[in-house]
């Protein structure tokens, strides 16, 4: 049953036909390509990242079960492009896995958002940081009071906006996600801690990176140097059987993202191109938690210290008189 008004659509019921296992389905393998997702081009021109069925399934199942924790009684608000990882994997695919309903809108509107939440009783939200910032900057409305929204999953939520969604909008569970379309690791704030991308089961490491010279630092033996403190480091993910790096359609572009002989001869790691640091979030089942710092290239040196443009921006955005800042 679909309700369609202009560019809005609410999918309420699942297909309950008897043909659940069509003859053609046995021709589709887990390793087959489900789709190509183009990267945002932060380190060059956009590239087509390969997304096989197994990655699409695994990510959406984990996000549905451990992230949203939704079921058939829930409805998700999704106004993100379905050709991007967030709108597709974190949004639509997670809904399908849960058997839940979803409200899909072609274009996000901050002024009508809470009216839509109330009208369609949306209990879950898939977000990106800018979407949340728009909502935080709106004047209080009657529709936002006693709203049914209880959980939100996405990426890029600013620390100051995080507080707004907890305190003003009353969202109990915020699951910040970190991962790349082409990457082989997923970080998730499973324990609902504040202002963190959470934890991961992947074999990851933070290595020393010289932001001034834009290069990885190595020891006398030619191997990378691990960071053992809470200082920011370049995040890398070991490539292996349980952490496959599918890469891009361009083989040369794929090879450029792989670091070899990192800690020992023959090992291979995916270079995320992001600076990450560990954070203390209190009791967390002994699991290390992380926080996004900045993209490589968006950091500068000041008085012999590495300074993240993103962190400077977060401090400026914490002032009530600042609507938005961009530091570069």
What are these language model-derived features?
Residues 13-17, 39, 56-57, 254, ...:
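Adenylate-forming
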Residues 179, 239, 243-251, 255-328:
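AMP-binding/adenylate-forming catalytic core of the ANL superfamily
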Residues 97, 119-128, 136-211, 224, ...:
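Gly/Ser/Thr-rich phosphate-binding loop
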Residues 18-38, 45, 69-75:
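Conserved pre-ATP/AMP-binding loop-to-beta segment of ANL
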Residues 33, 39-42, 76, 82, ...:
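Conserved S/T- and glycine-rich ATP-binding loop of Class I adenylate-forming
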Residues 57-75, 83-123:
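Conserved AMP-binding/adenylation subdomain of ANL enzymes
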Residues 1-11:
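Single conserved hydrophobic/aromatic residue that forms the stacking wall/gate
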Residues 206-236, 244-247, 280-287:
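Conserved beta-loop-beta connector loops within the AMP-binding
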């Amino acid at each position: 049953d679909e309700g369609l008004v202009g560019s809005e659509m609410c999918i309420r019921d699942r297909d309950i036909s008897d043909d659940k296992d069509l003859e053609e389905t046995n021709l589709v393998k887990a390793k087959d390509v489900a789709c190509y997702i183009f990267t945002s081009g932060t380190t060059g021109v956009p590239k087509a990242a390969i997304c096989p069925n197994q990655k699409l399934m695994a990510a959406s199942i984990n996000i549905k079960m451990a992230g949203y924790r939704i079921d058939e009684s829930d409805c998700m608000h999704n106004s993100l492009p379905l050709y991007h990882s967030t709108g597709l994997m974190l949004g639509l695919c997670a809904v399908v896995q849960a058997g839940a309903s979803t409200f899909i809108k072609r274009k996000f509107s901050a002024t009508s958002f809470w009216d839509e939440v109330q009208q369609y009783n949306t209990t879950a939200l898939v977000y990106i940081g800018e979407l949340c910032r728009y909502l935080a900057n709106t004047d209080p409305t009657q529709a936002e009071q006693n709203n049914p929204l209880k959980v939100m999953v996405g990426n890029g939520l600013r620390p100051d906006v995080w507080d707004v969604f907890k305190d003003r909008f009353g969202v109990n569970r915020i699951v910040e996600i970190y991962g790349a379309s082409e990457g082989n690791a997923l970080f998730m704030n499973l324990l609902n801690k504040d202002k963190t991308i959470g934890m991961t089961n992947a074999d990851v490491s933070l290595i020393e990176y010289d932001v001034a010279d834009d290069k990885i630092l190595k020891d006398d033996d030619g191997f990378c140097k691990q960071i053992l403190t809470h200082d920011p480091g370049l995040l890398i993910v070991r490539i292996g059987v349980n952490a496959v790096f599918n890469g891009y359609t361009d083989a040369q572009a794929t090879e450029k993202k792989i670091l070899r002989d990192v800690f020992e001869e023959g090992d291979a790691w995916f270079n995320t191109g992001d600076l990450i640091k560990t954070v203390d979030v209190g009791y967390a089942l002994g699991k290390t938690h992380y926080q996004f710092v900045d993209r490589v290239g968006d950091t500068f040196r000041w008085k012999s210290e590495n300074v993240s443009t993103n962190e400077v921006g977060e401090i400026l955005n914490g002032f009530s008189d600042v609507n938005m800042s961009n530091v570069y």
